[in-house]
Regions:
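PAPS-dependent sulfotransferase catalytic domain
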Residues: 13-17, 47-64, 68-216
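PAPS-dependent sulfotransferase catalytic core
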Residues: 1-67
Length: 218
C-alpha cells in the first residue's frame, strides 16, 4: 500500500453475496445497498464469498448509483457517523476535511475505485455485469432503510458541491460506469474503455491508475 489510508480505501476485504432467485452474485459497495444485502444474507443464509474465493466466479454483478447523489449521501453518512462516534469533534472542521481531501472514507469513495479493488480478486476472465442501481429494488425491497441516518438537505448538497475542485472528474468516471449499465465486461475491457474512448480526458487518470495498480494490485 502507498499510505495508511490505502488500507482503508482499498481493504483486503471484497465481498459478494449470491442472490440465487435472480442468478446474481452482487458485489457489496457501501451506499449501494450493501446494508440491505447483508441483512438479506443473514436472514436467509445466503452464500457470501470474499477475497480469493471470488476467483471461482464467472461473473459478478455490480450496481452503479448516480455519482452525485451517492457522493452527497456518502459524505452525509460519514459526517453523521463521526458525530455519533466522536462527539468532541467540531462539525464544521469535519465537513471541511471531507470536502477538501475528497475521499477519506469508503462511503463516498468513487465506485470506480471499488471496482479497482474488486479486480484484485477476480479471475482475469470474469465478467463484471454492470447494472443500474435504480433496478436494485428488484432484488432487495428494503434498501431505503437509512439505519438511523438523517437525509441531507439541499443546503448541505450545495455547500458540499460548490467550489469543489477536481470532484467533477471523479463523478464523471462513475457516470461512465453508469452509462455502461447492461454491459458485461472484464476488468481489462473496462480499463480499455476508459483509456481509449475517453483518451484525452482520462490520460492523467490512467497514469494515476497505473501508479495505484503497482502498489495495490497483485
Amino acid at each position: 500500500m502507498l499510505t495508511e489510508i490505502d488500507s482503508i480505501l482499498f481493504p483486503d476485504n471484497c465481498e459478494v453475496v449470491e442472490m440465487p432467485l435472480h442468478n446474481q452474485w452482487v458485489y457489496l459497495i457501501q451506499k449501494n445497498g450493501s446494508s440491505s444485502l447483508r441483512n438479506l444474507q443473514k436472514t436467509h443464509g445466503l452464500t457470501l464469498l470474499a477475497n480469493d474465493h471470488l476467483q471461482q466466479l464467472d461473473f459478478v454483478d455490480v450496481y452503479i448509483r448516480d455519482a452525485k447523489d451517492r457522493y452527497v449521501s456518502g459524505v452525509n453518512t460519514y459526517l453523521q457517523h463521526l458525530k455519533r462516534d466522536h462527539p468532541e469533534l467540531d462539525q464544521n472542521t469535519a465537513f471541511w476535511f471531507a470536502k477538501q481531501y475528497k475521499f477519506l472514507n469508503k462511503h463516498y469513495l468513487p465506485q470506480f475505485h471499488w471496482l479497482l479493488n474488486l479486480s484484485r480478486y477476480l479471475s482475469p476472465h470474469a465478467k463484471i455485469r454492470i447494472r443500474d442501481f435504480r433496478d436494485f429494488n428488484l432484488i432487495a425491497t428494503d434498501h431505503n432503510n437509512r439505519a438511523g441516518i438523517l437525509p441531507s438537505d439541499a443546503e448541505f448538497a450545495k455547500k458540499l458541491l460548490d467550489n469543489n475542485a477536481g470532484l467533477e472528474l471523479w463523478l464523471f468516471m462513475d457516470q461512465i460506469l453508469l452509462d455502461l449499465a447492461g454491459e458485461e465486461m472484464t476488468w481489462t475491457e473496462i480499463i480499455n474503455h476508459y483509456c481509449t474512448v475517453h483518451t484525452a480526458t482520462f490520460d492523467i487518470v490512467c497514469q494515476h491508475i497505473k501508479v495505484i495498480s503497482k502498489s495495490v494490485l497483485p
